[in-house]
């Protein structure tokens, strides 16, 4: 197959998945070229050494608020302007792709709007690997964005109350436009592939569209056991961002009696500075040794996973989560909250422990059970690596992906021949 790829991904799990998918397709003899905007991360696991990579301009200008009316509609105009700029970028990419005789478009997510608009403009069979819908629109994090403002204390017709109402009305209209555009872009693809059955349900809830599960793989050559001694350390892995629920991990470690309390090391590809400050203050107040490490190399990551006694996984409704499987390949068991896609990767008692809810005391007891029983932790870790190698290898994942792409080409041919 001749495959055109489009993405607008930051560093992290999504880009890691795309890299291995492109690598696997090339190794299976397919011809692949990639398109992306300049804001996509091209330094982390770059595609350039694997395939021809085309960087197509994307530009928009944040409008300055001028006057009282301008201040009210600024956020709306910025959202619409950014959508139109991304649409124009996708149109230019599509013109290049349409002229090159590709068999299929394989798109990935957009870091700004999650669903790419490129499917609207490419005249090819088209498949998107959608890591998740725009969760800010559909989930309470911590509050649904659509909820009405609190009832005013005074008169509903007071100028200040009317001003708040109008500003909120404009804000919500911008959200509605984002949701409309996301759904229309999703409907333009012949197939939506997702990383878990949980994600399939999320797509169905958000868009009312069917999606198919194409499980990802994990690189067992990178993530491996080094045979190092295990320290009394709990490790967490993921961006230092509110969605990762790191405050729960700190509370869980704090629930372990202080004489036996392990340290908590958190490794992230980036950190939200204000959130990290809050975490450090929380850890200090709870007497938890908390160490954050940001942007470390894969070698350092693998060593850290090998030295930890256990991984704690507290992400909120994570669609899939590569981190637990990466830890498992390093023979590190995982304690995770039983929500989101992690229920499809962690088998309770086989490669870790699933905790039924976000209760820090329950999570802490599960962590202590592994930290205080090194022999059992080793047994879980050995089982974990064997299970990941058997079920979560990249060759099986690429074979599934290849089948879905070929199926879409065949379906499109059948439609064209009617």
Regions found by a protein language model. Give the residues of each.
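Short hydrophobic beta-strand element within catalytic cores of glycosyltransferases
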Residues: 333-336, 346
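Conserved acidic donor-binding segment of nucleotide-sugar-dependent glycosyltransferases
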Residues: 348-349, 353-360, 369-374
């Amino acid at each position: 197959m001749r495959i055109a790829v489009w993405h607008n991904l930051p560093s992290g799990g999504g880009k890691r998945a795309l890299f291995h998918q492109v690598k696997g397709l090339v190794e299976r003899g397919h011809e692949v070229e990639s398109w992306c905007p300049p804001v996509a991360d091209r330094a982390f696991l770059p595609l350039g050494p694997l395939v021809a990579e085309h960087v197509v301009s994307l530009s928009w200008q944040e409008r300055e608020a001028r006057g009282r009316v301008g201040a009210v509609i600024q956020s709306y105009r910025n959202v619409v302007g950014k959508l139109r700029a991304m649409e124009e970028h996708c149109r230019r990419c599509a013109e290049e792709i349409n002229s090159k005789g590709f068999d299929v478009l394989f798109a990935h997510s957009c870091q700004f709007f999650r669903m790419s608009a490129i499917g609207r403009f490419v005249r090819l069979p088209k498949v998107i690997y959608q890591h998740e819908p725009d969760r800010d629109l559909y989930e309470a994090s911590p509050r649904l964005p659509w909820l009405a403002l609190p009832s005013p204390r005074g008169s509903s017709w007071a100028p200040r109350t009317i001003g708040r109402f109008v500003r909120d009305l404009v804000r919500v209209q911008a959200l509605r436009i984002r949701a409309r555009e996301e759904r229309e872009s999703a409907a333009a693809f012949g197939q939506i592939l997702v990383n878990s059955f949980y994600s399939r349900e999320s797509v169905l809830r958000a868009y009312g569209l069917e999606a198919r599960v194409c499980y990802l793989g994990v690189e067992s050559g990178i993530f491996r056991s080094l045979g190092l001694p295990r320290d009394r350390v709990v490790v967490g892995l993921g961006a230092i961002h509110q969605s990762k629920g790191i405050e729960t991990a700190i509370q869980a470690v704090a629930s372990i009696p202080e004489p036996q309390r392990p340290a908590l090391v958190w490794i992230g590809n980036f950190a939200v500075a204000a959130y990290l400050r809050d975490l450090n203050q929380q850890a200090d107040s709870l007497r938890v040794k908390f160490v954050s490490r940001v942007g470390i190399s894969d070698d350092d990551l693998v060593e850290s996973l090998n030295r930890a006694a256990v991984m704690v996984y507290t992400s909120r409704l994570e669609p899939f989560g590569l981190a637990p499987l990466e830890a498992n390949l390093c023979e590190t068991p995982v304690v995770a909250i039983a929500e989101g896609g992690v229920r499809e990767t962690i088998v309770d008692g086989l490669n870790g422990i699933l905790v039924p809810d976000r209760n820090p005391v329950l999570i802490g007891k599960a962590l202590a059970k592994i930290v205080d029983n090194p022999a059992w932790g080793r047994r879980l870790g050995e089982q974990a690596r064997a299970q990941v190698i058997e079920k979560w290898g990249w060759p099986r994942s690429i074979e599934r992906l290849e089948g879905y792409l070929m199926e879409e080409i065949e379906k499109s041919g059948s439609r064209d021949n009617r």
